[in-house]
């Protein structure tokens, strides 16, 4: 902890979070535990008094700034003339003043941490999405989602892919249909990507994996799904 004497009534200190832990306090305690927060503050005041002969008498004006590595605290005492009319009740409010200030400060710091965590989570999600997209572009299996049977039928009547190049499965889960296509090793990646793009004209991307679908969904069609759908649901407009 670094202490700087500003003048007769004001001191400034900076304490790192590692210093806080070295004194036997957890950072979380300072804003979740009233008793520990007050204990921490008065321990700091004892050190300040020992080093700078800064005796606490009467109300304090405290300003706290939370930084990435620690906390800066500026403490100012009332001038002598301010103490004349000070009551015992004013003294009793000092502990509450200290605790409330610590609570507000570390709540603010906690909010900053939450914001950092949120941004980090967004960054991680973006990285995961990018990785999933790269994986999709290099996989021989694609999975899409149809919101209802009508979308499946519409796609089936449009699709005219050569069926010996892939195997496919149609799953049903909670009235939603998932279509998985396994492409043969002879199919190049560009063709797979083009087929996926065509699928997305009728279907939607999904984060459901084939392992998940095998565990929780029901296979209702397999092997040349589009042909089966056309057979069961012929195009009456033709």
UniProtKB/Swiss-Prot annotation:
Family per record: Belongs to the MecA family.
Function: Enables the recognition and targeting of unfolded and aggregated proteins to the ClpC protease or to other proteins involved in proteolysis.
Subunit structure: Homodimer.
Basic and acidic residues bias (residue ranges): 120-136
Domain of life assignment: Bacteria
Lineage: Bacteria, Bacillati, Bacillota, Bacilli, Bacillales
Domain notes: The N-terminal domain probably binds unfolded/aggregated proteins; the C-terminal domain interacts with ClpC.
Gene3D superfamilies, sorted: 3.30.70.1950
Location of region: Disordered: 120-139
HAMAP family given in the database record: MecA
Pfam family, one: MecA
Name under which the protein is recorded: Adapter protein MecA
GO molecular function: protein-macromolecule adaptor activity
């Amino acid at each position: 902890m670094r202490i700087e004497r500003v003048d007769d009534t004001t001191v400034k200190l900076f304490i790192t979070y590692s210093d806080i832990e070295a004194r036997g306090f957890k950072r979380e305690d300072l804003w979740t535990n009233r008793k520990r927060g007050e204990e921490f503050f008065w321990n700091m005041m004892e050190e300040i008094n020992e080093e700078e002969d800064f005796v606490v008498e009467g109300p304090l004006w405290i300003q706290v700034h939370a930084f990435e590595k620690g906390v800066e605290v500026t403490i100012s005492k009332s001038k002598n003339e301010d103490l004349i009319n000070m009551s015992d009740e004013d003294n009793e409010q000092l502990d509450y003043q200290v605790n409330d200030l610590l609570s507000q400060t570390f709540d603010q710091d906690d909010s900053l941490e939450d914001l950092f965590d949120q941004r980090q989570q967004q960054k991680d999600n973006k990285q995961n999405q990018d990785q999933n997209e790269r994986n999709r572009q290099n996989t021989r299996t694609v999975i899409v989602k149809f919101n209802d049977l009508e979308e499946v039928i519409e796609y089936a009547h449009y699709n005219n892919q050569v069926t010996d190049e892939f195997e496919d499965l149609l799953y049903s889960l909670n009235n939603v249909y998932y279509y998985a296509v396994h492409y043969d090793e002879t199919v190049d990646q560009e063709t797979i990507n083009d087929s996926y793009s065509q699928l997305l004209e009728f279907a939607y991307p999904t984060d459901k994996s084939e392992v998940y679908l095998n565990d929780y969904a029901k296979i209702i069609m397999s092997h040349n799904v589009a042909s089966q759908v056309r057979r069961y649901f012929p195009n009456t407009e033709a």
